[in-house]
Amino acid sequence: MLGAIIGDMVGSPYEFHPWQGAAEAFPLFSPCSRFTDDTVMTVAVARGLMRAYGQEQACREAFIDAMHEYGRAYSRAGYGQRFFRWIVTGSREPYNSFGNGSAMRVSPVGWACDSLEETERYAALSASVTHDHPEGIKGACATAAAIFLARDGAGRDAIRDYVSFRYGYDLARSLAEIRPAYRHKESCQESVPEAIIAFLEGRSFEEAVRNAVWLGGDSDTQAAIAGSIAEAFYGGVPQDLREAALARLDDRLRGDVAAWYHWLSEHRGIRLDRKADPVQEQKTAVSATGRDIMETMPKAGMTGQWETTVEEGLLAAQVGSGEVRVLATPMMIMGMERAAMEAVRPCLPEDMTSVGTRVDISHMAPTPCGMKVRFEAKLTAVSANGRGLTFAVAAYDEVGPIGEGTHERVVVDREKFQSRAQTRGKHE
């Protein structure tokens, strides 16, 4: 929580007045540094968890109640127009937002939960009470997942690889590449990846926060997100920054912060007695969760195969790709695709699948009806975000090779992909 609060305060003076100098040159705290809606709603999420963690429906209601309660108590914290209307009207219905408010407040979830899957589930729950757009939910889940992984001991590469693969964010860019054209962005898809990159490029808690502010844009929220991940990664926050942040909170919020860390210790068995050093070396050990992620994500060398017997329905004369009774080229391609699917199927989450995007093959020999055929695929390259897959594919009948080439696939969210396809089907 304190990582997000410090980031919020450090970034607050620069939200609409971007810092133009070097990242290490601006003062972390100044007379203009203050807490904003990022801090208030982070505390609200923590309160919701303390009241009802373990009962998901009750926790959803607790999130709503706490957001209303704290939103009204701190009505001038700088909320977005739609969220403020949601607060003052007492609405309990979401409004399809994909703003980064869902990600800025989610950090307590990354600490409260016992597993990565539970973390993502509760992150979605905390987001969906207002930000029920898929991008709003994704931003919260990606942030909370990064926090959980960092807290669990995963290194930067494991965090980058998982978030890139699971949520499709491009984390291969550098801040130096992003900054020249970057503007004030408040959507999850245009600010959460950048905040995560700010953390990834930092070599200390302070550097992570400075990076997020130096980038420009929605600096307080980006720094809150980067700071929340950095707190988990470095095992706490530097003592001087902790004291400076607490001094800028009122008595109620200071009490809430203390209550949260006490709850983590007493009810979740998590202690943060050690404050992070100003500079800490990059982690070299890989956590069990990190190892699991790296072992299950698609990686070059994975293989798959599929076998069948050439029957009437696979013949060129039957499918319309020719007039002879041999294995049709489209059916050979289908077999190669099936083998490629089998190569990566075991490592994909249940809600994800792969779809073919390109084939470049040679059909070298005819295979008559009744003959057995075997299709093989080997994953030869994976894109930076883990979703673009290139395979070497081959086909064999009982005599020998009958086809070879390359095949490309992309990993997609099954439900979202199907929804887009149905939308195209309604086009007139």
Language model: regions and residue ranges:
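Hydrophobic beta-strand-centered segment that forms part of the acyl-chain substrate-binding groove
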Residues: 341-374
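Hydrophobic beta-sheet segments that form the core/acyl-binding groove
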Residues: 361-398
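C-terminal output/interaction extensions
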Residues: 403, 408-428
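Catalytic strand-loop segment that frames the active site of acyl-thioester-processing enzymes
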Residues: 294-328
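Intrinsic-disorder/low-complexity, polar/charged segments enriched in Ser/Thr/Lys/Arg/Asp/Glu/Gln
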Residues: 299-305, 331, 358, 372-374, ...
